[in-house]
Regions:
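Short, aromatic/basic amphipathic alpha-helical patches
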Residues: 17-24, 51-58, 92
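Thioredoxin-like thiol-disulfide oxidoreductase module
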Residues: 36-68
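Local sequence-structure signature of Cys/Sec-based thiol-disulfide redox active-site neighborhoods
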Residues: 1-37
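Non-catalytic, surface beta->alpha helical segment in thiol-disulfide oxidoreductase systems
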Residues: 74-96
């Protein structure tokens, strides 16, 4: 399974998040997406999904909520961001 913590496109265009999803869809793995933001009626137009961010923080063993997105796990193992996924796809799965 590929799990991706990401910024939703309807809130902010995140090229790396979009590309990570595209790469994941090119595999035969099941994909699970975790949005770290949600649309809100506040002045910003969004709010953070703190429960999702705190889950990510715990999974990677970080004491901070600040991350570069996307953050990706393959079969429960944290591999990092888009560049790590691209490297994994090329080296392990043999395509890119």
């Amino acid at each position: 399974m590929i799990e991706i913590y990401y910024i939703p496109e309807e809130i902010r265009k995140c090229y790396s998040c979009v590309r990570a999803k595209e790469l994941a869809q090119e595999t035969t793995h099941e994909i699970k997406m975790y949005p770290i933001m949600k649309i809100s009626d506040n002045d910003l137009g969004f709010e953070y999904n703190l429960d999702v961010i705190d889950e990510l923080k715990e999974r990677v063993g970080s004491s901070r909520r600040a991350f570069i997105y996307p953050q990706i796990f393959i079969d429960g193992i944290h591999i990092g961001s888009l560049s790590a996924l691209q490297q994994h796809v090329e080296e392990v799965w043999g395509f890119f």
